[in-house]
Swiss-Prot record:
Organism taxonomic ancestry: Eukaryota, Metazoa, Chordata, Craniata, Vertebrata
Chain positions listed as propeptide in the UniProt record: 119-153
Protein's name according to its UniProt entry: Insulin-like growth factor 1.S
Subcellular location: Secreted
Region (C): 78-89
Assigned keywords, A-Z: Developmental protein, Disulfide bond, Growth factor, Secreted, Signal
Tissue expression notes: Expressed in adult liver, lung, heart, kidney and peritoneal fat.
Domain of life the protein comes from: Eukaryota
Organism, scientific name: Xenopus laevis (African clawed frog)
Annotated region described as B, given as residue ranges: 49-77
């Protein structure tokens, strides 16, 4: 009886090993498939290089790249090291009609704002801003004085 029990145990172990090997083989194939897909995706995106960005996609990308600094659609005069370009060219010319990369996008970001103390902001607010003057519009006297009488035409 003990030999019969050993035989069934060995058969179970062998059957279990076969199932485990089959599952391992399937899992390896799935992992290999994922690895190949990842490789192809990365290779394709690396080969693509700079992209063209237009419209809302360009604005969203600039907001992401520049963050709280904000951005310009055209470079300020004298901004950047390449002065041979016309100052009329803007981000749309460079990134929508042609391809541009991250560094090109970053050139259109506004400079970082420097933190000011609360006192300097308060002082600046009172000294730098002129008082709003009321606009005085003269009365229209071209029709003449009609008094309280209403004229019909």
């Amino acid at each position: 009886m003990e030999t019969n029990n050993n035989l069934s145990t060995q058969l179970f172990k062998c059957y279990f090993c076969d199932i485990l090997k089959l599952k391992m083989h399937k899992m390896s194939c799935i992992h290999l498939l994922y690895l190949v897909l990842c490789f192809l995706t990365l290779t394709h995106s690396a080969a693509a290089g700079p992209e063209t960005l237009c419209g809302a996609e360009l604005v969203d990308t600039l907001q992401f790249v520049c963050g709280d600094r904000g951005f310009y659609f055209s470079k300020p005069t004298g901004y950047g090291s390449n002065n041979r370009r016309s100052h009329h060219r803007g981000i749309v010319d460079e990134c929508c009609f042609q391809s541009c990369d991250f560094r090109r996008l970053e050139m259109y970001c506004a400079p970082a704002k420097q933190a000011k103390s609360a006192r300097s902001v308060r002082t600046q607010r009172h000294t730098d801003m002129p008082k709003a003057q009321k606009e005085v519009h003269p009365k229209n006297t071209s029709r003449g004085n009609t008094g309280s009488r209403g004229f019909r035409m």
